[in-house]
Amino acid sequence: MTIVLRPGSVPLHHLADIYWNNGSAKLDPSFDAAVLKGAARIAEIAAGNAPVYGINTGFGKLASIKIDAADLATLQRNLILSHCCGVGAPLPENVVRLIMALKLISLGRGASGVRIELIRLIEGMLEKGVIPVIPEKGSVGASGDLAPLAHMSATMMGEGEAFYQGVQMPSKDALAKAGLSPVVLAAKEGLALINGTQTSTALALAGLFRAHRAAQSALVTGALSTDAAMGSSAPFHPDIHTLRGHKGQIDAGSALRNLLQGSEIRESHIEGDERVQDPYCIRCQPQVDGACLDLLASVARTLEIEANAVTDNPLVLSDNSVVSGGNFHAEPVAFAADQTALAVCEIGAIAQRRIALLVDPALSYGLPAFLSKKPGLNSGLMIAEVTSAALMSENKQMSHPASVDSTPTSANQEDHVSMACHGARRLLAMTDNLFGILGIEALAAVQGVELRGPLKTSPELEKAAAVLRSAVPVLEDDRYMATDLKAAIEVVASGALVSAISSGILPVLEA
């Protein structure tokens, strides 16, 4: 499916479609006129003698050097080639597709002054499956994501490497196979392509989409754990959460309440249970997961604005003047990435404590040790819980803020930077870890509710358990566990666990 982009008003769910489905995108034709107008203004400046940054001058600390008109195309080509300094593994294809779509949005507002040919080329690359090889490391998040976006731009010029329908090859060959021609950059176009926050923003969006899927999954696994531990649903009473007033908490409490509705296990111990209160990892799920949902909603608002922004420099303004500014500084994205990291860390931390509760017979209210039917002879989920602790601890270390760690670059011209790019990139690893924790919780919780038989859990949670059991059989005796963990994690990461739940129960992501 091809998403039609209207710069300035692209909704978050369109960007999520591109990310989750390796989608294509194109600019709404009604924006072509703005692009043509901006390009004409830059061509007019390039034909004159007045020095304007990025059009007929050097870059960064070299901005005071005037460039001859005959060298303007060479200036832009040199800019791209010299800035291709990324290192590390290539970014995932769906992230690069998101980068390219975000660049279409930014350029499509007409304030960058690029020709319509660049827009058409990016659209064609997305449609035909020409995906630039962008090394994952090299940006400090100001002045824009220079190195990664230079690698994207190099492919447009026929330089560097690209994937064509999943196969890596020289960019010129990828373009040729797709029937596309490389571009010769005109005045300012190289700068417009690399001077923006699109790499950081795409990575932050990927982290957000994954974190929200995990947050939804955690409500399902948390409800399963609550029933497996014969926990109380009383703390999910709506009035408790309304009295506090936080939307995320209200939504989380509602989800947990609805997920547990109709559980035979819960009905069996409403009366006569000598326990007065459950541990916090059961009782305080709405407060913890709800706070994380609120944090992700705040991030969503920031990133939807940034996704629709023009983050180039200089910009062609509405009065046709060309003015230098600092929209390339990715501080909002850096803060958003740090916020997402906190939410990811805490969702995993409380989930891990639920796993620990379920495998401990001193806490699990009658479940066998490590959820094994024959403990002693079998170790059950003993080391699966240890793995979840390792993943949780790793996320704690990675959750420390990146945004406060500025360092001066480029001969002190770029003396404060955001560190948004690696702050956002770590979210991929952190959400992988979180999917791991939640996959292990799903294994433990489903095993736990089954051990409560013949009593059944709720109809909604039965559907979730069935999805897990379609991938992982019941653990009767010890077996090679890595296969089980991998399959359970995929059930969570793929969204299959969330998809099993009836629409309207789990909170959706809204900016």
Swiss-Prot record:
Top-level division of the source organism's lineage: Bacteria
Annotated GO MF terms: histidine ammonia-lyase activity
Enzymatic reactions: L-histidine = trans-urocanate + NH4(+)
Cross-link (5-imidazolinone (Ala-Gly)): 142-144
An individual GO BP term: L-histidine catabolic process to glutamate and formate
The keyword Iron is annotated on this UniProt entry: no
GO terms for cellular component: cytoplasm
EC number: 4.3.1.3
InterPro entries documented for this protein: Aromatic_Lyase (IPR001106), Fumarase/histidase_N (IPR024083), HutH (IPR005921), L-Aspartase-like (IPR008948), Phe/His_NH3-lyase_AS (IPR022313)
Protein name in UniProt: Histidine ammonia-lyase
Origin species: Rhizobium rhizogenes
